[in-house]
Amino acid sequence: MAIIQTDYKELYVFAKNLDEFANELEYQMRKLVSETNNVTGYSWRGRQAEDFAALINDTDKDMQKQIESLRELVDAINEKARDLEEIANRKFK
C-alpha cells in the first residue's frame, strides 16, 4: 500500500516540477527573443543582425516544440499517477 501511494504522490510532484521547468524555459526563451530583437534593432545593422535574429527565432521555434513535448509528458505522467492513485484507493480502502 505505502509503495503505490508513495509512487503516485512522487509522480505528481515530478510532473509539477517538470511543468514548472517548462514554464521557466518558455519564459526565458521569450525574454531572450525580446532582448535579441531589441539589440538587433538598435545596435546592429545589416546582415549580421538579420542572421543573429533569424538564429534566435529558429531556436525559439525549436524550443517551443520541446516545451510542448514536455507538457505532453507532464500530462502523461499525471495520467499514470491518477491510475496508480485509483488502484491504491480501490485496493487499500
Walk through the language-model features, giving the residues of each:
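N-terminal secretion-targeting helices of virulence/extracellular proteins
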Residues: 1-93
